[in-house]
């Protein structure tokens, strides 16, 4: 784990320099497991992100913007009651562990002095953010409640006494004595795994880097390793407070550990936050897809069962033709089938006359023929629904936080979700704008099916070129105000269509290109569904860096 005690040691120094003595002005909880504090310190405004996420747990200053819930939850309200307007008196790391404490002082509604500690524990799935009364060490509230049935050693509930996580009895590498350190370095194996067991707060990467430093002059190099000044750095798979042996040579320069984390988590945390916000929608779409796929299998089986319709008609025809050869008192008859040149055995109802038996087969044939027509229509409708839901599923997988609400609105309008009590109608956004590589042509991209419909049938002019990944879910893309785009611009548009499709990560994607005037929306068609003929097909390989560089 990159955010280990060693990294937190360096981060604590950064936070102290920027935040100690500062005043907490605003408190928000944009996501289920993350808190953002707006702090004014040294005539500057800072945003402090506290995350109790099981994978991305961390503490950092951030430049990122967040959308906050319209109605704050209980934890946010309690934090505001105790911390809004509070002064941060001290920021302290517990030894070299992944626990950070913010000691604050404030006054309550009647002017009495309040002292509290906001504790951030970064411990994987057990990560937590806990507000504690400093005088009594009682828990006021926590972002995650832990009852006795979950953890008999320490409950994390309002009113419980705060107990620190169990001690591991490992040594703090910053305060261990020279005598003890000499004994360990002289007698113990210095493998990364053993270093993690002996010394507190070392993640796997840090322990591996330390082991490399201890190949010669162990005591001197041990102290030198932990005395190094902070140099924020990316590693081959993560990040570190210092350049490690596996740090890439060419990488951006980071002014602070916080800017390093903003860079590293900008996509990873965003995708996870989208997943949190979109969880209900993803589950609903997955459920509807499963239901419709099962329905399609059943309908296709029923259609297969109607394949006897032609044989039923032939039996009626043969009974009519050879009526005089059909007995009245037998359960079957064998007649020459002039359709095949072979004899055909035909079952009879002994309670009916030969003529009535023939009519019985004709009536059965008519029912089967009507069933074929009905089932064919149902199958087409079910297939259309599956295609639509797959497109929504694709867009949910690629959506930003800002786009989730609009996809939710789409699912409400199409009847897959009900509007929540007092939920307002979400204002529809316009398709996204991208600048082609010629530096002047604007390309529009629909980011959901409502935007796709608006772009294709309301915004696109007749002669403008329209693009869509071939035969797979994806965005509608239109080159605007350029009726004769260059091949380079066409490629740009095709790459956008490929990137914003189910084939985003494919090496070669087929993309259809056609004039917008040749597009047709069938009556009753689902949002985003179009038909067309006469298209040309391009083959492109989209790259994320190019797409991001085109975004306006």
From Swiss-Prot:
Any GO BP annotation: rescue of stalled ribosome
Consequences of knocking out this gene: About 25% decreased adherence to human HEp-2 cells, about 50% decrease in binding to immobilized fibronectin. HEp-2 cells treated with mutant bacteria secrete less IL-6 and IL-8, activate ERK and p38 more slowly and to a lesser extent than with wild-type bacteria.
Coiled coil: 271-317, 357-398
GO molecular function: ribosomal large subunit binding; rRNA binding; tRNA binding
Gene3D superfamilies, alphabetized: fibrinogen binding protein from staphylococcus aureus domain like, ibrinogen binding protein from staphylococcus aureus domain
Keyword Coiled coil: yes
Alphabetic keyword roster: Cell adhesion, Coiled coil, Protein biosynthesis, RNA-binding, rRNA-binding, tRNA-binding
Superkingdom field: Bacteria
Cellular component GO terms held in the UniProt record: RQC complex
Domain remark text: The N-terminus (residues 1-268) and C-terminus (271-552) form 2 separate domains; the N-terminus is globular while the C-terminus is elongated. The N-terminus binds to S.suis cells while the C-terminus binds to human HEp-2 cells. Incubation with the C-terminus stimulates ERK and p38 phosphorylation in HEp-2 cells.
Misc note: Repeated attempts to crystallize a full-length protein yields proteins cleaved between the N- and C-terminal domains.
Function: Key component of the ribosome quality control system (RQC), a ribosome-associated complex that mediates the extraction of incompletely synthesized nascent chains from stalled ribosomes and their subsequent degradation. RqcH recruits Ala-charged tRNA, and with RqcP directs the elongation of stalled nascent chains on 50S ribosomal subunits, leading to non-templated C-terminal alanine extensions (Ala tail). The Ala tail promotes nascent chain degradation. May add between 1 and at least 8 Ala residues. Binds to stalled 50S ribosomal subunits.
Protein family according to the UniProt entry: Belongs to the NEMF family.
Subunit structure: Associates with stalled 50S ribosomal subunits, binds to RqcH. Recombinant protein interacts with the N-terminal 30 kDa of human fibronectin (FN1).
HAMAP family: RqcH_B
Descriptive protein name: Rqc2 homolog RqcH
């Amino acid at each position: 784990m990159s955010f280990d005690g060693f990294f937190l040691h360096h981060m604590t120094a950064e936070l102290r320099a920027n935040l100690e003595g500062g005043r907490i002005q605003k408190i928000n909880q944009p996501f289920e497991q993350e808190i953002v504090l707006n702090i004014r310190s040294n005539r500057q405004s800072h945003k402090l992100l506290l995350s109790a996420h099981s994978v991305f747990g961390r503490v950092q200053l951030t430049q990122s913007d967040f959308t906050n819930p319209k109605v704050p939850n209980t934890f946010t309200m309690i934090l505001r009651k105790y911390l809004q307007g509070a002064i941060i008196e001290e920021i302290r790391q517990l030894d070299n562990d992944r626990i950070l404490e913010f000691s604050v002082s404030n006054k309550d509604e009647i002017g009495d002095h309040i002292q509290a500690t906001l504790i951030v524990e970064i411990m994987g799935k057990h990560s937590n953010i806990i507000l504690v009364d400093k005088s009594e060490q009682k828990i006021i509230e926590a972002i995650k409640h832990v009852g006795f049935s979950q953890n008999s050693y320490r409950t994390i509930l309002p009113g419980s006494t705060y107990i620190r996580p169990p001690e591991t009895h490992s040594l703090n590498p910053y305060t261990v004595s020279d005598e003890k350190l000499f004994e360990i370095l002289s007698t113990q194996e210095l493998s990364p795994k053993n270093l993690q067991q002996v010394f507190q707060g070392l993640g796997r990467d840090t322990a591996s880097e330390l082991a490399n430093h201890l190949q010669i002059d162990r005591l001197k190099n041990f102290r030198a390793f932990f005395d190094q000044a902070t140099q924020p750095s990316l590693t081959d798979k993560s990040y570190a407070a210092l350049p490690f042996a596996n740090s890439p040579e060419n990488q951006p320069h980071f002014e602070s550990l916080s800017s390093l984390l903003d860079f590293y988590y900008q996509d990873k945390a965003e995708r996870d936050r989208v997943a949190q916000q979109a969880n209900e929608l993803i589950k609903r779409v997955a459920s509807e897809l499963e239901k419709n796929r099962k329905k399609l299998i059943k309908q296709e089986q029923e259609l297969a069962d109607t394949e006897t319709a032609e044989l039923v008609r032939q039996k009626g025809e043969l009974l009519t033709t050879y009526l005089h050869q059909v007995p009245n008192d037998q359960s079957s008859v064998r007649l020459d089938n002039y359709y095949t040149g072979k004899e055909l055995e035909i079952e009879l109802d002994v309670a009916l006359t030969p003529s009535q038996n023939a009519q019985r087969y004709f009536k059965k044939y008519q029912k089967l023929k009507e069933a074929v027509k009905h089932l064919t229509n149902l199958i087409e409708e079910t297939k259309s629904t599956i295609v639509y839901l797959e497109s929504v599923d694709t867009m949910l997988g690629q959506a930003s936080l800002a786009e989730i609400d609009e996809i939710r609105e789409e699912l409400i309008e199409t009847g897959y979700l009900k509007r929540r009590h007092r939920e307002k109608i979400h204002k529809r956004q316009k398709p996204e704008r991208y600048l082609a590589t010629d530096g002047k042509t604007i390309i529009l991209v629909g980011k959901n099916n409502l935007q796709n419909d608006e772009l294709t049938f309301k915004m696109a002019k007749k002669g403008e070129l329209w693009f869509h990944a071939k035969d797979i879910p994806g965005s509608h893309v239109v080159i605007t105000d350029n009726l004769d785009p260059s091949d380079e611009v066409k490629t740009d548009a095709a790459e956008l269509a490929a990137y914003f499709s189910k084939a985003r990560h494919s090496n070669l994607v087929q993309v259809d290109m056609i004039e917008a005037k040749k597009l047709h929306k069938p009556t009753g068609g689902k949002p985003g569904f179009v038909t067309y003929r006469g298209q040309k097909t391009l083959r492109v390989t989209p790259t994320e860096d190019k797409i991001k560089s085109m975004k306006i």
